Amino acid sequence: PFDVETDFVPVAPLIDVSNVLTINPNVINVRNLKEFVDEIKANPGKYNYASTGNGAGTHMAFAEFNARLGLNMVHVPYKGGPEAITSVLRGETCCIMNQVQTVLPHYKSGKVRLLGVTTAKPVEVIKEVPTIASSGLTGTKGFDSSIWFGIFAPKGTDPAIVAKLGQAVREVLELPEVRARFESQGNAIRIETPEQFKKTVHNDRLKWAQVVKDAKISID
């Protein structure tokens, strides 16, 4: 076992990966987030939501959402992304909070409906889909449940090397062609200094620890 804050040195984040509330309209025929919440509240325990596994980002995002809004849904964990999204397409579950790049082809083909993205800002490739935080619903203010990827170095790495690596990463991420490539997949560039990234890691650990506790999440 290891501790990400004591055994590694944060170098730089790379991208924020947004999840999006994705529904099968043949199972739950609603057109916006308010209708979704009203339907779930009117039928506690009726609807199942899929995730890519216990404790996965898709699970954590929905767990936080349900806890904030007081929703009673049944969690159905699958062993990975393909099984989870397939369950929604088949109507075995009503919905999932999955990565934009995963659901995008199904959205474009009309098989699923997208109700809200989990990031604080809209996602470039699906700008027509509002953020959950902007819905105005009680409990959604400030909602930001994104996944990020970043680069770390081993504990004890020379700070000068960490700073140089971080600067190199930021310069690459700021290239227009790199930004465009990530945005086309539903992701957003994240620019932070090593010190800022260190704070992000610490704050997110505290946040998700509380979500795990409140939602009584266990890991397989």
Regions found by a protein language model. Give the residues of each.
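Conserved helix-loop-beta element of the AMP-binding
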Residues: 9, 36, 111-123
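Conserved functional loop/turn residues at catalytic and ligand-binding sites
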Residues: 32, 77, 92, 99, ...
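Hydrophobic residues within well-ordered alpha-helices
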Residues: 62, 88-89, 107-110
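Hinge/capping helix and adjacent helix->loop/strand transition within the periplasmic-binding protein
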Residues: 1-83, 132-137, 142, 148-181, ...
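Extracellular/periplasmic bilobal clamshell ligand-binding domains
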Residues: 193-219
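Beta->alpha turn/N-cap motifs
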Residues: 61, 81, 98-103, 117-120, ...
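Alpha-to-beta junction loops
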Residues: 43-47, 71, 89-98, 111-114, ...
